[in-house]
A protein has these predicted regions:
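Beta/alpha (TIM)-barrel catalytic core signal, keyed to glycine-rich beta->alpha loops juxtaposed to Asp/Glu
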Residues: 3, 143-328
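Alpha-helix N-cap and loop-to-helix initiation/capping positions
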Residues: 39-47, 73, 77, 110-118, ...
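N-terminal binding-site loop/beta-alpha segment at the start of enzyme catalytic domains
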Residues: 1-89
Length: 338
């Protein structure tokens, strides 16, 4: 299969590791399903398994998940998808967001901790759910509580020394926070949100990572499905109650109309190359030299087909300029005060 060969050969070294990863990886947030604080609505596990296996068959060689996705369910689905596969992908997961009966019935289901014992317990639980002996990349999900990040990072460094994880990284950290923990142990990678609608990391964080050989695997390059080309106002209106996007400003007016207008520009640019709007959105993030690879979610095999081409697609300079012009001419609208 030619596309599998093409995707597989476009690998990049992740930071200070020996891992050569494909330009896009499979993001497993949505396959955690609904019925939790940051859920995406109901999800068929068979569709999830098919999506993962199809992505791997097409050459994607890494999966990013987290213990908290679906309150452990995402990791279990990943394990199911990998059963019996001879060639296993790299598996990345994350810690720091935990749940228990104490918090289950409260409005905020998730409790955050970077205490030594908590991190160790999370790792053991992730290894069990993923059915793995070692995690390829173990990441702190959020720098919260901030006064515990040193203790959490020291614990990850110790787990690496013990051989339970191969490399360690962080997600959603600022430059100042990375400076603090880098005195304890080197950072292999940062996982920040980055898309044409969320560019806050461009000024300081991405240049810092590039300067310090910290790999960058950005999440939400398609803004949680908004830039895929499949999103409409009608579809947004029909989001289930347990889909976190219902309450996100980018999926509400006045931003929604502006964002869907951007999608039409991406559709126009992509059509000249046989690419989807989502592939254009992903390729735009990969154009930044500080970005190693992008995390891309899919909930079924068909969605994988709509994003796989981003691994090799490169935007022309004039196309990048058209996107920049649109974003400049159409700033984020502010909802009028009542």
């Amino acid at each position: 299969m030619q596309i599998a060969e093409t995707v597989q050969t476009t690998t990049r070294q992740l930071g200070n590791s020996d891992m050569q990863i494909t330009a896009i990886g499979f993001g497993a947030w949505a396959i955690g399903g609904g019925d939790w604080q940051f859920g995406w609505g109901s999800q068929d596990d068979n569709d999830s398994v098919a999506a993962i296996q199809h992505a791997l068959d097409l050459g994607i060689n890494w999966i990013d998940t987290a213990a908290v996705y679906g309150l452990g369910h995402s990791e279990e689905v990943v394990a199911r998808a990998l059963e019996g596969r001879q060639q296993k992908p790299y598996v990345f997961t994350k810690c720091s967001m935990i749940w228990s009966k104490k918090f289950w019935q409260t409005k905020d289901q998730i409790h955050r901790s970077l205490k030594r014992d908590s991190v160790r317990n999370e790792l053991e639980s992730s290894l069990r759910r993923l059915k793995l002996d070692v995690i390829d990349l173990y990441q702190i999900h959020w720098p919260d509580p901030e006064d515990e990040i040193e203790e959490g990072w020291e614990t990850l460094a110790k787990l690496k020394q013990e051989g339970k994880v191969r490399y360690i990284g962080v997600s959603n950290f600022s430059v100042a926070q990375m400076e603090r923990i880098s005195k304890i142990a080197p950072i292999t990678s940062l996982q920040p949100p980055y898309s044409m609608l969320n560019r806050g990391v461009e000024k300081e964080i991405l240049p810092y990572c590039q300067q310090h050989n910290i790999g960058v695997i950005n999440y939400s390059p398609m803004v949680s499905g908004l830039l895929t080309g499949a999103m409409t106002k009608e579809r947004v209106a029909q989001f289930p109650q347990d889909d976190w996007r219902r309450n996100n400003a980018r999926f509400q007016e006045p931003q929604l109309s502006r964002n869907l207008k951007l999608v039409e520009l991406l559709r126009e640019i992509g059509s000249a190359h046989g690419r989807s709007p989502g592939e254009v959105a992903i390729a735009w993030t990969l154009n930044n030299p500080a970005v190693t690879a992008a995390i891309v979610g899919a909930r079924n095999a068909k969605q994988v087909d709509g994003i796989i081409g981003a691994a090799t697609f490169r935007l022309q300079l004039d196309e990048i300029a058209r996107i920049e012009d649109f974003l400049t001419a159409n700033p984020v609208p502010v909802k009028p005060s009542k």
